[in-house]
Design a protein with these regions (language model features):
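Zinc-dependent deaminase catalytic domain
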Residues: 1-144
Length: 144
């Protein structure tokens, strides 16, 4: 995930991997949509980049969500997300509320993410809540 985060051009680079049985299935990083008021605005979070890559074919099929979850086997995967600071130290990368909602809906049961102390926290998504707003969400919703 660190190698992926290093590819990001954003102010807060995030990298993510989706693993299954100890094997990396797919990796990704956060990407910008455009420059808005001279700042990079995040359009695609790292965790959603990974999920989009893994799920793109199945999600286009006209199946109900339960069937898609079964085919994808995401319940057996772990989603890992990290953030790098300017000096390449780990920072807080707990998914925002929107990403957490999507992660749960797709049936991912475990998530690992970095915190501000350089640790990786592993949680069962059933008990993982997030009211965190990404910086891009704050920029578009300044009353946060």
């Amino acid at each position: 995930a660190k190698k992926q985060a290093m590819k990001s051009q954003l102010r807060f680079p995030h990298g993510a991997i989706l693993s299954k049985g100890g094997k990396i299935m797919v990796s990704g990083f956060n990407k910008s949509r455009s420059s808005f008021m001279n700042t990079n605005q995040t359009c695609l979070h790292a965790e959603m980049d990974v999920i989009n890559k893994y799920c793109s074919v199945i999600m286009k099929k006209k199946l109900n969500l339960k069937k898609k979850q079964e085919i994808l086997g995401l319940s057996k995967c772990i989603l890992w997300v990290i953030r790098l600071s300017a000096n390449n130290e780990l920072g807080s990368s707990k998914p925002c509320g929107v990403c957490m909602k999507n992660i749960k809906e797709l049936g991912i049961k475990k998530i690992g993410y970095s915190n501000d102390y350089g640790e990786i926290i592993i949680e069962n998504t059933k008990y993982c809540t997030s009211n965190h707003m990404s910086n891009a969400q704050k920029d578009y919703n300044p009353i946060y």
